[in-house]
Amino acid sequence: MFAGLQIRKVLALTLACATLLIVSACAVFQPADPNGPRSNAPQYPIGLSDVGTRLEEASLAWYQLSQRYGVSGKTEANLHPYTGTLESLPANLPASIHLPKVGDPSKPTEADTREALRRFIVEWQRLIGAEPDELSLVERTDEPTGIKVARYEQRPFRYPLRGGFGNLTIRFRSDGQIVGLSSNCIPNADRLQAALSNLTPQVTREQAVEQVRNRQNLAATAVVEPQQLVVYAQPAKAPQSAPTSGLEMRLAWEVNVTNGPVTKVYLDAMSNEIIATL
């Protein structure tokens, strides 16, 4: 009888423990919230990383490259205030900068020239502000003066980049001497793309057309055609204590207008603001 009592106590204790475990598990594995996870909304507009740090990094890159090319260490780079990229080469450099030599220097082919440009971009990418695989050559021309020009567009995002940024121009002589270099590419674009990919447009294509037509007071004869979503880069509003606070990236609808006072409108796809017209 005593043994039976002990067995019943053990069974009761086991049952109590099992019940406690089941209740605890139910408390941990709550049903999913039908409204989705409760988290803070992503920051918007998406700002470029601290431009001050970027300017310091670019200044160091210029110093290192200028030493490699025999340029005086006292020469300072002309850096873009918003992107920290090389806006122009300093005037009156004490030494020349050349494209890398590819093929026969006396008779370079167009393929040789493009390969030399590619190698130059790889070497100067910290000042250019773009990864080589983000850049597409959109124009290669020769001016009447003999100066050769190569123009590139930066295409780092899922959507096209607008706002006048993401451009690289290299000017050089037939012997490969660089006479001009200008970039306003977006540095660290991969980090920005990660943030942009989390955005879901809050304005539909049809709503964008309606908003543009109403806000621009377009005539009935005007034709409004939404083209595509784009990433629009524009200077952020700087605090009074600073000359600039870098760039902001916005997801926007690019809308073409025919027979109207403007030809193109950029409507923020998140905030429903008109951010630019052309």
Describe the function of each predicted region.
Residues V28-L278:
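Segments that shape or occlude catalytic/ligand-binding pockets
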